[in-house]
Curated annotation (Swiss-Prot):
Its cofactor is Mg(2+). This is tRNA dimethylallyltransferase. The record marks T100 as: Interaction with substrate tRNA. Substrate binds at T11, A12, S13, G14, K15, S16. ATP binds at G9, P10, T11, A12, S13, G14, K15, S16. GO terms for molecular function: ATP binding; tRNA dimethylallyltransferase activity. Pfam families: IPPT (PF01715). Monomer. InterPro entries: Dimethylallyltransferase (IPR039657), IPT (IPR018022), P-loop_NTPase (IPR027417). It is an enzyme of class 2 (transferase). GO terms for biological process: tRNA modification. The gene is miaA. It catalyses: adenosine(37) in tRNA + dimethylallyl diphosphate = N(6)-dimethylallyladenosine(37) in tRNA + diphosphate. Catalyzes the transfer of a dimethylallyl group onto the adenine at position 37 in tRNAs that read codons beginning with uridine, leading to the formation of N6-(dimethylallyl)adenosine (i(6)A).
Amino acid sequence: MTKIVVIAGPTASGKSDLAISVAQRFNGEIVSADAMQIYRGLDIGTAKVTKAERELVPHHLIDIVDMTDKFSVAEFVTRADQVINDIAKRGKLPVIAGGTGFYVKALLGQQPLDFVASDEAEVALLKQKSLPTLVTMLKAADTILASRVDLNNKQRVIRAIQIARHGKRQEDISRPTYDALIVGIDWPREILYERINRRAQKMLDDGLLSEVEHIMSVGGESIQAGKAIGYKEFFPYIRGEVTREQALLAVQQDSRRYAKRQLTYLRHQIPGLIWLHGTDAATKLTSEVKAWLD
């Protein structure tokens, strides 16, 4: 069973720095589990590791799709499995740095996956058809799948048609099981919030608005990347609806709320997670990993 280290935690908690530290100490490579760092061109607002940091330790699943593309949790897991297998085959330790809790949960096999990204245009066309027509289409595409679906439920029939056309049933997909050491970084609430506020200000100082303008030029709120905290709050500023300071405060507030949701999710949805205090997380994790590998 492949061993992996998983480092989770809220935004601005220091996951990237800790992952680099562990990867350097234990001959590892880092796999990003962040739903927004997958996008090319979204560097400042997603707090991506720098080029210099990537030269210290190889990083994977960063800058893998264009910002106008959609990307599902199933696609993440498929790619992550491949990368982890490659890292382990080369005798290195896969270190997962995860800001997106449901990515981590899915990778660990703790939740069912939807292996087909939903195509909104296709769904709209299918919804126009009658239920009997849809059932006929499903039976023609996959009789086995049709026998397992509630044929009186139009939404489920539509989803089954999509799976039959484009994807695989989950039971047909064999996934690896990992021996995972899972840790989370925790800070006192006031310290975490201060880290969040400082980082938001630094992003703005570092040129965040150029990324915001680029997102707006290719779709704005209509694309998945345009829904990210740190970007969407500045769209009203670019349109002249709020001040720069108001937009920054909105980013800070939304980021703090998001951090609270992340912590709640990790505490209740990721079994076996070991919490480390942010001030000595590197020292504690080094000890944990050493004992675990031995």
